[in-house]
């Protein structure tokens, strides 16, 4: 079996709407160390689900996306110690994640068992002083604002860039968040 065909852990993310993704990914490309920036901007919901769950994960993501997108907003600039992120607030997205966590409860890693702090990483694996400087710079102009969540996706993780496994887009009407 080739490395590309070998079973790989599944990562689950929320997908941003086009304009929000372009903006967040532009920040990430501008500030993430280029030699480590293998991924576009994303919101991770689960870091490591067993590869054997792919069919069930795909079915559940499609079912969850049959309704409207969860309201969400960018709440603040977060300092991660050696990086910077944008904190995402969305009780509805957290409820979707909790539904998935309940379904896969016995199969979650300790990291995925914990309640996540939803965020979009802009910079990571830099010196703490560089992270603090970027956080200060981003906070100067940052204002909380709505964030469009367009869908959910599953990815294969094989140690490098993630490989898409499936994508499901929300089909219901969008609800604005103040």
What positions do the PLM features span?
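Basic, often amphipathic N-terminal segments
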Residues: 1-71, 91-151, 161-178
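Charge-rich, low-complexity N-terminal segments
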Residues: 82-87
């Amino acid at each position: 079996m080739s490395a590309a065909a070998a079973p790989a852990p599944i990562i689950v993310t929320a997908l941003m709407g086009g304009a929000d993704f372009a903006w967040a990914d532009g920040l990430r490309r501008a500030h993430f160390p280029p030699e480590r920036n293998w991924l576009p901007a994303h919101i991770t919901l689960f870091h490591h689900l067993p590869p054997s769950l792919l069919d069930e994960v795909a079915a559940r993501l499609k079912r969850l996306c049959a309704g409207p997108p969860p309201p969400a907003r960018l709440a603040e600039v977060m300092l991660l110690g050696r990086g910077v992120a944008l904190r995402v607030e969305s009780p509805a997205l957290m409820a979707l994640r909790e539904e998935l966590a309940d379904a896969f409860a016995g199969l979650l890693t300790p990291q995925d068992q914990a309640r996540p702090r939803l965020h979009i990483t802009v910079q990571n694996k830099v010196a703490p002083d560089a992270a603090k400087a970027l956080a200060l710079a981003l906070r100067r102009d940052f204002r909380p604002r709505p964030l469009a969540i367009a869908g959910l996706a599953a990815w294969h993780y094989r140690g490098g860039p993630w490989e898409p496994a499936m994508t499901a887009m929300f089909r219901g009407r969008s609800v604005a968040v103040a």
